[in-house]
Curated annotation (Swiss-Prot):
The chain crosses the membrane at residues 13-33, 38-58, 69-89, 93-113, 121-141, 152-172, 370-390, 407-427, 431-451, 459-479, 482-502. One of its GO terms (biological process) is carboxylic acid transport. Belongs to the aromatic acid exporter ArAE (TC 2.A.85) family. It is found in: Cell inner membrane. Keywords: Cell inner membrane, Cell membrane, Membrane, Transmembrane, Transmembrane helix, Transport. This is p-hydroxybenzoic acid efflux pump subunit AaeB. The gene is aaeB. Its main location: membrane. Forms an efflux pump with AaeA. Could function as a metabolic relief valve, allowing to eliminate certain compounds when they accumulate to high levels in the cell. The lineage of its organism: Bacteria, Pseudomonadati, Pseudomonadota, Gammaproteobacteria, Enterobacterales. It comes from Salmonella typhimurium (strain LT2 / SGSC1412 / ATCC 700720).
Amino acid sequence: MGIFSIANQHIRFAVKLACAIVLALFIGFHFQLETPRWAVLTAAIVAAGPAFAAGGEPYSGAIRYRGMLRIIGTFIGCIAALIIIISMIRAPLLMILVCCVWAGFCTWISSLVRIENSYAWGLSGYTALIIVITIQTEPLLTPQFALERCSEIVIGIGCAILADLLFSPRSIKQEVDRELDSLLVAQYQLMQLCIKHGDSEEVDNAWGDLVRRTAALEGMRSNLNMESSRWVRANRRLKALNTLSLTLITQSCETYLIQNTRPELITDTFRELFETPVETVQDVHRQLKRMRRVIVWTGERETPVTLYSWVGAATRYLLLKRGVISNTKISATEEEILQGEPVVKVESAERHHAMVNFWRTTLSCILGTLFWLWTGWTSGNGAMVMIAVVTSLAMRLPNPRMVCIDFIYGTLAALPLGLLYFLVIIPNTQQSMLLLCLSLAVLGFFIGIEVQKRRLGSMGALASTINIIVLDNPMTFHFSQFLDSALGQIVGCMLAFIVILLVRDKSKDRTGRVLLNQFVSAAVSAMTTNVVRRKENRLPALYQQLFLLMNKFPGDLPKFRLALTMIIAHQRLRDAPIPVNEDLSVFHRQLRRTADHVISAGSDDKRRRYFGQLLDELDIYQEKLRIWEAPPQVTEPVKRLTGMLHKYQNALTDS
């Protein structure tokens, strides 16, 4: 396919984007809005953003959800701007500096919350800055300007959502159904690999792929939940299926590890059962029925605990999967599964990374302010706005430098493209609403094609072009103003890029160490006799951290194996029959405190000291278990955990 070719699957979204832009433009001028540009720009960004992220037409609900986040972020930003202006109207410089700090604060928050919701916080940061900069000459018009901006943005979002509904958005439900079947087959094949106890690299690749697919399925669940309220029952089942899929991975990998020391635990009967190849979910269903009969015949005590747990989890997976596909009423058996343990939310391990993002955004905005005041350039405020926009949106993504480069390419492409519209197209079409709408529709259509291909600069070009062409009411054509706006965008992106290059993010290794220590803390916290704590489901949170570790350190198998071993230890200790008495309960609390100290330690020396203390306490704990005559189901996992911590002590304590 050529670089400028148009694929059939890209046409529908390109028409949808063009329709959203035309609707916003028509409504903006029809109702005599002062700056219809904001409505058009909002419609374009809300519609094109999810398509750029997805690399194609977004699924149903994605545009609607992004629109809601933009409304929330805009309102938060407007309220913050009003508070800042009312409090500091007599000190304009201080007011702008506080806005720079506010933009940094919002970026810090957006780095810590879920990636789906971070857009609202990033938007609220630069919205406040835009309002404060715009009303510098007429501060008394702040409430009116904030209200107009909110109204125009809501209109733009409404147009994007309406265009999405008009062109029958894709439903993700069929993809979810197919992935559920495929995932169960892959889970069975992973257990086959683990029972064969073959090449460790092949097993690592298999479980790593399943972790990614399970995380992707959770993302599909979020999309399905946004799509329609009729998928509420499917959403509940998919939440439980996420935990079951992670449980299957854990039990398979534990089966592999057990065979390193005790291969005789896996009997020939089960080895023969798992030798049968499977291709479809029906094959898996037949095999599970055979296994359940074998387990009933041999007895639970004669069945390895990992296989027994795996078969039970796979059976529950099959039951819930059928419910998701049919979307029928939840049965009593399903309700019992769904009313399982409460899921514990993950605590962010990227606090240092978030602080780096705070300083990057704050410093770049302050640098833009100084540049504006020093040069007195009429479009210095435009440069400041672009700095805030780029840093607020770039910081929450894995590769901020590439986002900046995308914006730089986009603003450079917007200069000749905007020039064509400013000098030729708009002056010749402004007297006809039809021609004006058609000219903007052509722009939206062709950039919509490139956005779906994730062409570098396409998203930035769309936003930057709409921002600099004259879409105000009334239209005024001042070439110097156009040139200033276009150059201001380019300079702003350049300054943001320079700050990102200068303020280095060296938090990667620290984040990796914090993640590994959080796995250790989770394994230690599983040693408890507290009934409520034992019922907590930490598995989704632990695998979410493992997924982050895999993204931060691609290909680092030792880190992944260590993390997975800690997850297995957590699950095994959580189900272990620990003797219930006050002596052990007190010591459990002491172990948890020490593990928390390891995570929160501010220096390597403190961390090593607390880690050494944790190892000593684990040795004492093993002695206590011997005194209280704990069964092997307790003593063996604790011994394995202690051995792992001794082996990887340096990796867990050194920065």
